[in-house]
């Protein structure tokens, strides 16, 4: 087996990051690789499809019950799922109280100190991407994750989040050695989505690792708390995830330091593809009805 690779999946909330990452990791496990998933999202949904569970008990919740994280054993926080994938969720505090990023820092330190990274080929961090606080940036900042894969779509805010995450990677690239592995486009069936994803990847100086087509079988599998790889292994969609896993596996050492763009450049790109029209400043703030009346 190859030496340990530490990767991370970042992306805008609701983009399908956890679903995409779990299917990709299930495919990597199917290929014979030994996997550890570290969920870094307060929703604690980064391992549910691997474990067939609603939500795994988190390190922070177990530490609170035990007294402190030092009172925990590795076996208490780590669960074994599909294809022997090891699963851990960092968790976060109650809503409105404390820093959710604290769970990420506490968890990774605990796992390192207790030998969780031994005898594995991949550690994968599944990280909330809308929030740029230090806790969530920790896998990047502390050189825990060496390859970042950004899950996005052709929607403007998903691309905006991808660009913001690239800014975070750029900030720590020289001090920590983290690199952008590429973009993964999770299709939302928006206009010219593939073209936009490829164009954004080009502007960021990276590659579109894979374009994952939209398929209802993903939702069917999720309702049963399963990956498509396990639920429908012979399906076309399962093969897409296998292809994505193969691309990630063959991408080791090929990451780049990204070249983020400005908001104006992002809007210009949308205009170039006809998604946004050039807006006259006099039209800003006008409703569709008001604009129709002006042009009548």
Swiss-Prot record:
[4Fe-4S] cluster binds at residues 99, 133. It catalyses: N2 + 8 reduced [2Fe-2S]-[ferredoxin] + 16 ATP + 16 H2O = H2 + 8 oxidized [2Fe-2S]-[ferredoxin] + 2 NH4(+) + 16 ADP + 16 phosphate + 6 H(+). It holds the Pfam family Fer4_NifH. It comes from the Bacteria. Its EC number is 1.18.6.1. Coiled coil: none annotated. The key enzymatic reactions in nitrogen fixation are catalyzed by the nitrogenase complex, which has 2 components: the iron protein and the molybdenum-iron protein. Homodimer. This is Nitrogenase iron protein 1. It comes from Azorhizobium caulinodans (strain ATCC 43989 / DSM 5975 / JCM 20966 / LMG 6465 / NBRC 14845 / NCIMB 13405 / ORS 571).
């Amino acid at each position: 087996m190859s030496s340990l690779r530490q990767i991370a999946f970042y992306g805008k909330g609701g983009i399908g990051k956890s679903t995409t990452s779990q299917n990709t990791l299930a495919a990597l496990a199917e290929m014979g690789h030994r996997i550890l998933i570290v969920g870094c999202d307060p929703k604690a949904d980064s391992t549910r499809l691997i474990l067939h569970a609603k939500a795994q008990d988190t390190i922070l919740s177990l530490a609170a019950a035990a007294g402190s994280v030092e009172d925990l054993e590795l076996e208490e926080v780590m669960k074994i799922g599909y294809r022997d994938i090891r699963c851990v969720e960092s968790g976060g505090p109650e809503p409105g109280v404390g820093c959710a990023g604290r769970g990420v820092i506490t968890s990774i330190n605990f796992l390192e100190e207790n030998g969780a990274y031994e005898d594995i080929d991949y550690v994968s961090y599944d990280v909330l991407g809308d929030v740029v606080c230090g806790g969530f940036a920790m896998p990047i900042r502390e050189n825990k994750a060496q390859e970042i894969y950004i899950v996005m779509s052709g929607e403007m805010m998903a691309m905006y989040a991808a660009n913001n995450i690239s800014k975070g990677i750029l900030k720590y690239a020289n001090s920590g050695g983290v690199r952008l592995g590429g973009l993964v486009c999770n299709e939302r069936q928006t206009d010219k989505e593939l073209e936009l994803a490829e164009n954004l990847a080009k502007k960021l100086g990276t590659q579109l690792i894979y374009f994952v087509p939209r398929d209802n079988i993903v939702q069917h599998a999720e309702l049963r708390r399963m990956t498509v790889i396990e639920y429908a292994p012979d399906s076309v969609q399962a093969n897409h995830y296998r292809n994505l896993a193969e691309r990630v596996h063959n991408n080791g050492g090929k990451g780049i330091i990204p070249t983020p763009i400005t908001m104006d450049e992002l809007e210009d790109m949308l205009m170039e593809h006809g998604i946004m029209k050039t807006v006259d400043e006099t039209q800003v703030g006008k409703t569709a009805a008001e604009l129709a009346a002006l042009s009548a």
